[in-house]
Amino acid sequence: MNFLRKIVRGCRDEEDQKPALVSAPPDDDDLWLPPPEYVPLTEITGRKNMRNFCVNGEVKVCSPNGYSFKILRHILRSFDGVYSGNQRMRGLVKVVIGLALSGGPIPEGMNWVYKVRRTLVFQWAESRGPLDGEELEYSQEITWDDDSEFVGSQIRVSARQCHIQGRIWCINMNSRACQLWSDMALKTQQSDEDRNTSLLLE
């Protein structure tokens, strides 16, 4: 247990260090996911629950044994059970986390840092999603460990409605990034125009 405390302390002590050069995960990590492909939707049935959100997301992962997407997937699979933020924005938070993790990490000491800042258009199913004008400031730490590995993650997501033109949130279902999205069990609706495109509904 003291060993784990030392690791956590080590991760936090190095937070303020100057970021190193941008680096991609090892080539032999077959779970590395490239950025998802965006497919604009020209028409969406019912615009009642569609809103533009300016989002900022940051995921900081502390993994003393090196970068491992297998552990990130484990954390994301159990995300619904540990999420402590606004339940009306749970789906939005998962999308932002997924987008951040699908990008290139920046190493900071023992940490890998992923960031995303975008304007996205979300559509929720009837009576779901955030209230009109509702904003989100979400921050949480999630840890996972077994006999051989300890991983700590810090998640920060902020979202507010904005009127800047955004892109419909959707992904190409043929992309390898879907390995990550499917783990998060997002409720989606298939586009009539493009069978490879889905829209967030939860």
Swiss-Prot record:
The keyword Magnesium does not apply. InterPro entries: Rhabdo_M (IPR006870), Rhabdovirus_M_sf (IPR038617). The keyword Membrane applies. One of its GO terms (molecular function) is structural constituent of virion. GO terms for biological process: viral budding via host ESCRT complex. Signal peptide: none annotated. It is found in: Virion membrane; Host endomembrane system. One of its GO terms (cellular component) is virion membrane. A motif (PPXY motif) lies at residues 35-38. Keywords: Apoptosis, Host membrane, Host-virus interaction, Membrane, Viral budding, Viral budding via the host ESCRT complexes, Viral envelope protein, Viral matrix protein, Viral release from host cell, Virion. Pfam families: Rhabdo_M2. It is a peripheral membrane protein. Homomultimer. Interacts with nucleoprotein and with the cytoplasmic domain of glycoprotein. Late-budding domains (L domains) are short sequence motifs essential for viral particle budding. They recruit proteins of the host ESCRT machinery (Endosomal Sorting Complex Required for Transport) or ESCRT-associated proteins. Matrix protein contains one L domain: a PPXY motif which potentially interacts with the WW domain 3 of NEDD4 E3 ubiquitin ligase (Potential). Plays a major role in assembly and budding of virion. Completely covers the ribonucleoprotein coil and keep it in condensed bullet-shaped form. Inhibits viral transcription and stimulates replication. Plays a major role in early induction of TRAIL-mediated apoptosis in infected neurons. Most abundant protein in the virion. Belongs to the lyssavirus matrix protein family. This is Matrix protein. It comes from European bat lyssavirus 2 (strain Human/Scotland/RV1333/2002) (EBLV2). The gene is M.
